[in-house]
């Protein structure tokens, strides 16, 4: 089939010649049965969802409990991001750095072009225009994903500002990121499809210089929804380096004091460290309120007043389901319950509702994420996959801040880094200054969980929680953070803090109750910004004493809180070789400023008790 005979190619709703020629080129290569330009309408969502139900990909859920919501069960081989198959194909290998997989871009293009040849036979090729961040932005970051997956089109409507409005923003010659995706499962004439098409061969490839994303073989999450990690972090971090801003793996939280003053806080945590829970915080301190602007990604640019302003480039939440419940995150549960949600790899109850580990109640019988019968206390495997997801519109969140769609963004007062550490790292620490803050972010360590590849319990260094998401060399990335500070008025920069909700006592109990009680730590952070709270100077930064925290009404042992705040110099001296090993791994591009901070920390710890 030539491009001239592929239905839909000649009825494109745009005159953008760059887009049209790319669409034609991809259609000739991949040989779909037809081409459809996605418009992002509700009608399209309903039509494609019904199509997915007919195909066996979607199960429509109980409309009384989850209106207009669906469950998809993936192929068991296609359940998560695949870091081992993710590549940064910069022109020079040094520009990808030691944390990324690299292949020569011309070799990768040749290899993947061969994979793409004929890969959409028997399928529809969808052209999906989208915008990351508010459509009204001065410099909107536009993209077009070409995909052969209806699941992707439906999910992109939830996760991005997708469709006709984004296409119109491109005009006749506007720049856009080219994002090409195929599940890699062509259908021959008469061949029956499967509910979740994918391929054993997978590549998720980024070309930072040309701002392109090529993905093949996976239909799942961040591998296939190319506006998410691929564009919003890997490609956007390269854009941010070139344009003088930050694209970060951060939530954006609005805290409102009893005096009705708002503070905006960005926070970077690795997976399974409570990012979504903090983004949707329900403060336990009387008079304090919280609203959310995002739970995963923040783009921060300097405003005219010299402060950093953040926007959330996403339009929906793509959250991990297990562990989400009415205690840990009631606002996420309310958002999901409003409907219009796509669940992936959770379990199905007998009355058409969803269930996962951590939810209240113990259903006696379920259909598990593999489509098998599951019985309470009899089946040994989990009912939901540990990385199962909900994809739900942000606009449904009951505590969504009114500024969530403001193209100007919100001024950030504090940046938090955090990890999961049983020992050593106190509940909260304030950095000495911006460069020291960059150092504690760049050396962030977190114990591994089921959400990350590697041995559970090992401390993995995860700079700014961006280890899998940096679109260029980690040393250059950290230097860019230092340069952001050098090129601005430090008095206008956010204060930097490090938090650890997960410290345990000798009896292995958590020392801090967490969840809504984390508002007490957030209050201390705000009071430090306002120069109203005390703290103790330690070799690692300023740490509150028990008396510095507002613990009124807290059901916790003060001795536990004191232990959670403790800075043990010997434990930190034992941490130094682990940090040094990580800095050596960064290699020749390690910024001098980070080496200086490490030497200064060693010096401060030398004589500390």
Curated annotation (Swiss-Prot):
Record keywords: Cytoplasm, Decarboxylase, Gluconeogenesis, GTP-binding, Lyase, Manganese, Metal-binding, Nucleotide-binding
Transmembrane portions of the chain: none
Amino-acid positions noted as binding GTP in the UniProt annotation, renumbered to this chain: 272-277, 389, 420, 515-518
Subcellular location: Cytoplasm
GO BP annotation list: cellular response to glucose stimulus; gluconeogenesis; glycerol biosynthetic process from pyruvate; oxaloacetate metabolic process; propionate catabolic process; response to lipid; response to starvation
Binding site for substrate: 81, 220-222, 271, 387-389
Principal location listed in the UniProt entry: cytoplasm
Any single Pfam family the record assigns to this protein: PEPCK_N
Cofactor note: Binds 1 Mn(2+) ion per subunit.
GO cellular component, one term: cytosol
SUPFAM superfamilies in the record: PEP carboxykinase N-terminal domain, PEP carboxykinase-like
Enzyme Commission numbers on file: 4.1.1.32
Residue sites binding Mn(2+) per the record: 229, 249, 296
Function noted in UniProt: Catalyzes the conversion of oxaloacetate (OAA) to phosphoenolpyruvate (PEP), the rate-limiting step in the metabolic pathway that produces glucose from lactate and other precursors derived from the citric acid cycle.
Family the UniProt entry places it in: Belongs to the phosphoenolpyruvate carboxykinase [GTP] family.
UniProt-listed NCBIfam families: PRK04210.1
Protein name: Phosphoenolpyruvate carboxykinase [GTP]
Source organism phylogeny: Bacteria, Bacillati, Actinomycetota, Actinomycetes, Mycobacteriales
Gene name of this polypeptide: pckG
